[in-house]
């Protein structure tokens, strides 16, 4: 039962498999058949049985179908057999017709072949003509290219190459000759680049050689333009200036018209001679090279090369020769080369596009300007000649004006000119120091003698001197100053003129120029003239008379300073009402010189007194005085009287101070002589002789050698000596010791130390001269008194030391 159940379940499965085999592609039969074997054991046998049964069923159906169509097939075969004879007939007819057609078409075929052959030839000819018409323009353009190359029309040649490559070659690119032509174009381009670069190098070398001439031409044009502007300005100032005199208006206008006319004539003559930069340099190579590299699409290479080479040339131009500072021609050559360089760059800037830009030229100029300033600052420091420095300044101004006309900033150059101006002033100061020294060396330091009205007017024309009393005097007469005063005044004015020459054309206002001139003049007065005066005053050969004249000279020079201020105001055309921040320091300069001269007078006077005092030859052990003053002292007093007579031309205080100083110094010298430590013994006779000399000094002081002293002021210079000598002459020790320290003391000016020193010298003398005097009562009493006084004086000296 189990087996029968399984068999019943297998049968539907086999039917499904058979249906699948019949309905699917044979490529998929394998998996279907595998499922038969994957089933129950002996399933494939049952499947085979089922398959055989299925095959038998299909055979039966085929047999049934064949039986059904068999009669129709037989009828069809019978019909075919009937039409076979007709088909044979038709074939024979077709073959015959074909043969007759073939025979008839042979001639047509031959004629047709001839026609075809002619048509092919005609087509080929047409094609050749078309191709030749296509190639001829290419060949003509290539021939044109060769002609342009031979005629050195390289930019046109490049344009022709572009046309060949973009228009003509694409039309005939299939031909071999086209490829050959195309292969030659890169080499032609390289040749053009090399040739144009060679031309550019020649151009760069040419402008390097012509920089001098280009710069000289540009600077000449700028100078002519400036001269014309100055002439017009001067004419305007002459016609409309505030300081013109009405009576001279017509004359000034006529002169200004003549000046302007001459300037215009010179301008016209120079214009005919002056060449432009285009006349001096052929710029076509740089134009061609620029166009060629632009056409080649390599503008950057060309620009970089040009700028690199020009920067190298700029460095060479900016490097001056070591001897540039020796002559003005060296500076001129240096400036013209630089101007020529930047004039060329400015021209290139305006005639090309992109080769040189304003930013590039400004950068190059700033680099050059820093180098120029460093060079000028270094080399100008070697210039010791003010004329050379002035010419250098004029060159720098023309140089700056020229480049400013081309749009370059030159403010730093004018700032440099202010530095050079300081150096110029230093060279001027050195030069005028020599001039002043020569004037002082040649001066005789005596008042200027005048013998006639002409001589008087000549001096007045040189120096602003006004003295109504002197004018009233008859000839011959004398100016109070010496001949150096008008010469110094003239030279100060010459210095101002020289300083003004540098200040011109600095693009500064009249007020600024006026201020600069005043500062320069102050330097001349305070540094140079003051130094020369001080050196003169300190020279050993300058005596008291010369010193007195120097003081008088400085007084008149000081008074002339206001005229120098007016002179500066006039030449700078500044209004008198303008408040000047800078004044001339003549007052302090000449006051210092006078003080130095006064001090030197005091010093020399004291030295002269010392010389006389050194001639003193006292016999310090003499028993009695000679009864008359010493000869050296009388000579000294006579000398002082003559000197103080010369001092009458000095200001009162100076003469009084000199007289008081001389008396005080004489008193001090006499006191030092009396108290000299090397002097061991002094007799009473020597003291009496010394007293006679002091009396002469007091008489001299009381004679009023210099007017202006009140009462016995001058005699007070000898008060210390007088009281000391009176103390010893009267031997009034009791009064001195009793009144010491009292304001009303008779011997208030006697110093205990001085009294002690002199008393000890006399004590030693008494001991030496009176060896046996101790046996006499009076001498013993005197000796005891001296010893007692000495002890008391020593006590006073000790008390003074402790108090101090």
UniProtKB/Swiss-Prot annotation:
Keywords: Cell projection, Cytoplasm, Exocytosis, Protein transport, Transport. InterPro entries: EXOC6/Sec15 (IPR007225), EXOC6/Sec15_C (IPR046361), EXOC6/Sec15_C_dom1 (IPR042045), EXOC6_Sec15_N (IPR048359), EXOC6PINT-1/Sec15/Tip20_C_dom2 (IPR042044). One of its GO terms (cellular component) is exocyst. Pfam families: EXOC6_Sec15_N, Sec15_C. One of its GO terms (biological process) is intracellular protein transport. The keyword Flavoprotein does not apply. It is found in: Cytoplasm; Cytoplasm, Perinuclear region; Cell projection, Growth cone; Midbody, Midbody ring. The keyword ATP-binding does not apply. PANTHER family: EXOCYST COMPLEX COMPONENT 6 (PTHR12702:SF2), SEC15 (PTHR12702). The exocyst complex is composed of EXOC1, EXOC2, EXOC3, EXOC4, EXOC5, EXOC6, EXOC7 and EXOC8. Interacts with CNTRL. Interacts with RAB11A in a GTP-dependent manner. Component of the exocyst complex involved in the docking of exocytic vesicles with fusion sites on the plasma membrane. Together with RAB11A, RAB3IP, RAB8A, PARD3, PRKCI, ANXA2, CDC42 and DNMBP promotes transcytosis of PODXL to the apical membrane initiation sites (AMIS), apical surface formation and lumenogenesis. Belongs to the SEC15 family. This is Exocyst complex component 6. It comes from Rattus norvegicus.
């Amino acid at each position: 039962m189990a087996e029968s159940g399984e068999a019943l379940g297998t049968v539907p499965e086999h039917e499904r498999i058979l249906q699948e085999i019949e309905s699917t592609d044979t490529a998929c039969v394998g998996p279907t058949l595998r499922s038969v074997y994957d089933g129950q054991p002996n399933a494939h046998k049952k499947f085979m049985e089922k398959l055989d049964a299925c095959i038998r069923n299909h055979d039966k159906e085929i047999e049934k179908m064949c039986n059904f169509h068999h009669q129709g097939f037989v009828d069809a075969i019978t019909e075919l057999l009937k039409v076979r004879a007709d088909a044979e007939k038709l074939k024979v007819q077709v073959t015959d017709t074909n043969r007759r057609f073939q025979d008839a078409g042979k001639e047509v075929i031959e004629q047709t072949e001839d026609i075809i052959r002619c048509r092919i030839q005609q087509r080929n000819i047409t094609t050749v003509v078309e191709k030749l018409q296509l190639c001829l323009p290419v060949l003509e353009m290539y021939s044109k290219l060769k002609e342009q190359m031979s005629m050195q029309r390289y930019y046109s040649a490049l344009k022709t190459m572009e046309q060949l490559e973009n228009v003509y070659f694409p039309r005939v690119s299939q031909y071999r000759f086209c490829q050959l032509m195309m292969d030659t174009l890169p080499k032609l381009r390289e040749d053009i680049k090399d040739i144009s670069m060679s031309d550019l190098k020649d151009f760069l070398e040419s402008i390097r050689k012509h920089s001098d001439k280009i710069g000289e031409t540009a600077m000449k044009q700028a100078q002519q333009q400036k001269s014309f502007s100055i002439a017009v300005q001067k004419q305007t100032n002459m016609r409309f200036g505030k300081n013109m005199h009405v009576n001279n208006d017509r004359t000034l206008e006529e002169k200004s018209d003549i000046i302007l006319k001459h300037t215009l004539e010179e301008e016209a003559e120079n214009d005919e001679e002056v060449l432009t930069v285009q006349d001096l340099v052929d710029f076509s190579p740089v134009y061609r090279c620029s166009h060629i590299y632009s056409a080649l699409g390599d503008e950057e290479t060309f620009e970089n090369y040009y700028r690199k080479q020009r920067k190298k040339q700029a460095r060479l131009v900016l490097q001056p020769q070591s001897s540039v500072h020796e002559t003005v021609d060296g500076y001129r050559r240096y400036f013209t080369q630089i101007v020529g360089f930047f004039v060329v760059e400015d021209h290139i800037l305006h005639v090309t596009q992109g080769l040189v830009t304003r930013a590039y030229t400004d950068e190059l100029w700033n680099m050059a300007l820093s180098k120029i300033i460093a060079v000028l600052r270094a080399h100008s420091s070697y210039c010791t000649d003010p004329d050379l420095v002035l010419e250098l300044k004029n060159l720098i101004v023309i140089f700056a004006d020229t480049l400013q006309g081309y749009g370059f900033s030159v403010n730093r150059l004018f700032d440099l000119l202010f530095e050079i101006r300081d150096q110029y002033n230093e060279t001027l100061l050195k030069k005028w120091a020599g001039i002043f020294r020569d004037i002082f060396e040649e001066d005789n330091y005596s008042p200027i003698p005048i013998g006639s009205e002409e001589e008087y007017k000549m001096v007045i024309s040189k120096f602003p001197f006004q003295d109504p009393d002197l004018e009233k005097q008859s000839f011959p007469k004398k100016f109070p100053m010496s001949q150096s005063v008008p010469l110094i005044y003239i030279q100060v004015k010459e210095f101002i003129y020289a300083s003004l020459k540098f200040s011109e054309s600095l693009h500064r206002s009249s007020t600024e120029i006026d201020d600069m001139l005043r500062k320069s003049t102050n330097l001349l007065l305070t540094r140079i003239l003051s130094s020369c005066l001080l050196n003169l005053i300190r020279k050993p050969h300058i005596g008291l008379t010369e010193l007195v004249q120097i003081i008088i000279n400085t007084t008149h020079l000081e008074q002339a300073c206001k005229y120098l201020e007016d002179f500066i105001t006039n030449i700078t055309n500044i209004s008198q009402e303008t408040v000047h921040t800078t004044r001339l320091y003549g007052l302090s300069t000449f006051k210092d010189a006078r003080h130095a001269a006064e001090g030197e007078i005091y010093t020399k006077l004291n030295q002269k007194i010392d010389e006389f005092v050194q001639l003193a030859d006292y016999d310090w052990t003499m028993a009695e005085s000679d009864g008359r003053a010493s000869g050296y002292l009388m000579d000294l007093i006579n000398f002082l009287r003559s000197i103080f007579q010369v001092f009458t031309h000095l200001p009162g205080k100076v003469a009084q101070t000199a007289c008081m100083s001389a008396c005080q110094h004489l008193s001090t010298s006499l006191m030092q002589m009396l108290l000299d430590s090397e002097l061991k013994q002094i007799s009473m006779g020597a003291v009496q002789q010394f007293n006679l000399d002091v009396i002469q000094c007091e008489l001299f002081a009381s004679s009023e050698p210099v007017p202006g002293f009140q009462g016995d002021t001058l005699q007070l210079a000898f008060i210390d000596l007088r009281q000391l000598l009176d103390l010893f002459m009267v031997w009034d020790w009791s009064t001195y010791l009793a009144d010491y320290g009292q304001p009303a003391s008779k011997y208030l000016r006697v110093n205990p130390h001085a009294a002690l020193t002199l008393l000890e010298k006399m004590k030693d003398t008494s001991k030496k001269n009176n060896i046996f005097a101790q046996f006499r009562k009076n001498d013993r009493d005197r000796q005891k008194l001296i010893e007692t006084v000495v002890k008391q004086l020593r006590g006073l000296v000790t008390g003074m030391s402790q108090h101090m």
